[in-house]
């Protein structure tokens, strides 16, 4: 599910897969070949999240950042099941 937040809209820049019950909100950029799996939450409400090419965010992981912070995953990165990544 893609959700806007305060005028910020997630961007899918290249056929990224997002599972039906995953949430991608706000200032999030998904690069080509990236995947976001079941139950994962990517919250770009306070800062930007960039998911690099061919990276995957596995089931139930949460990515979020504080105001002014950012999370950037490079290419071919795996964020494991139920991980918490906070920038």
Show which residues each predicted segment covers.
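A short, polar/charged loop-to-alpha-helix boundary motif
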Residues: 49
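Left-handed beta-helix
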Residues: 14, 19-20, 25-26, 31-32, ...
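Extreme N-terminal tail/first-helix region
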Residues: 1-16
């Amino acid at each position: 599910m893609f959700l806007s937040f305060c005028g910020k809209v997630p961007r899918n820049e290249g056929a990224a897969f997002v599972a039906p019950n995953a949430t991608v909100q706000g200032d999030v950029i998904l690069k080509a070949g990236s995947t976001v799996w079941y139950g994962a939450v990517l919250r770009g409400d306070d800062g930007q999240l960039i998911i690099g090419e061919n990276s995957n965010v596995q089931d139930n992981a949460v990515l979020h950042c504080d105001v002014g912070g950012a999370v950037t995953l490079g290419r071919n990165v795996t964020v494991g099941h139920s991980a918490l990544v906070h920038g």
